[in-house]
């Protein structure tokens, strides 16, 4: 109860660090939300009117560390947004009735096939590929919505954050939406437990569950394992982390 209330209050004020927090009036325009000494902007990851995402996605990408290629989470770039005081990455998945969605997908394919031109033929092929994957591998269709809330000091140019995100996501083949003019609606719909308020026609897009999982944030801080037999490796930042190689690092009593 109290923890949930505190979390919602902190989300409302975009303040997850200070011990004491205060609420401020909101000033909202098409580009951002101003609250006290902070300005926030909500970035919708996908524009449903013009979906610019790669046809194939992986759960990770690679970076170079000391001339060595290392895998990182696909959206690990969220850790490096310039001037950002707070970053919230909302990941929403809605599981619809599968038979109904497959029926709608078949109707959509037939509609595209009835108008033979290059763009419609590409759409038909894409739908066929999805249907083949679902039939062969028993995959699940989901509706998803991803958005970023970036908070910066009020005297900071938030366009720097926008340029940074557009540049980094473009390297992954994703062009974030430029039509996020409904800032207040996106902010309110992103509240914990309020995701069902997102507009089904405008804010959600249909994809396979595997592809949606690839866009979820999977990074976490690596901690040393509890074991008396410590073998130290370093993480990507060069911080030593103790790794147990016995496979029994549950409690000390399990080790002999």
Regions found by a protein language model. Give the residues of each.
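N-terminal pre-Walker A segment at the start of P-loop NTPase domains
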Residues: 221-243
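Generic "edge-of-domain/loop-turn" microfeature
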Residues: 155, 248-250
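Core alpha/beta catalytic barrel or barrel-like domain that forms the active/cofactor pocket
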Residues: 179-186, 239-247
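Short glycine/proline-enriched loop/turn "hinge" motifs that connect secondary-structure elements
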Residues: 136-141, 233-235, 245-248
């Amino acid at each position: 109860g109290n923890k949930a209330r505190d979390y919602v209050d902190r989300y409302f004020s975009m303040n997850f660090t200070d011990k004491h927090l205060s609420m401020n009036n909101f000033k909202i325009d098409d580009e951002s939300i101003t609250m006290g000494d902070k300005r926030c902007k909500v970035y919708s990851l996908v524009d449903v009117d013009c979906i610019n995402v790669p046809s194939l996605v992986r759960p990770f990408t690679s970076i170079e560390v000391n001339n060595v290629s290392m895998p990182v989470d696909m959206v690990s770039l969220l850790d490096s947004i310039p001037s950002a005081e707070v970053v919230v990455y909302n990941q929403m998945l809605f599981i619809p009735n599968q038979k109904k969605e497959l029926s709608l997908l078949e109707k959509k394919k037939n509609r595209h096939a009835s108008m033979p031109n290059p763009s419609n033929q590409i759409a038909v092929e894409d739908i066929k590929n999805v249907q083949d994957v679902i039939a062969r591998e028993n995959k699940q269709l989901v509706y998803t919505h991803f958005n970023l809330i970036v908070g910066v000091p009020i005297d900071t140019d938030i366009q720097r954050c926008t340029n940074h995100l557009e540049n980094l996501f473009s390297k992954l083949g994703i062009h974030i939406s430029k039509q996020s003019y409904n800032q207040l609606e996106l902010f309110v719909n992103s509240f914990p437990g309020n995701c069902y308020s997102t507009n089904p026609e405008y804010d959600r897009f249909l994809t396979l569950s595997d592809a949606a999982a690839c866009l979820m944030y999977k990074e976490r801080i690596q901690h040393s394992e509890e074991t008396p037999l410590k073998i130290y490796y370093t993480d990507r930042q060069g911080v030593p982390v103790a790794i147990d190689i016995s496979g029994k690092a549950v409690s000390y009593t399990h080790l002999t």
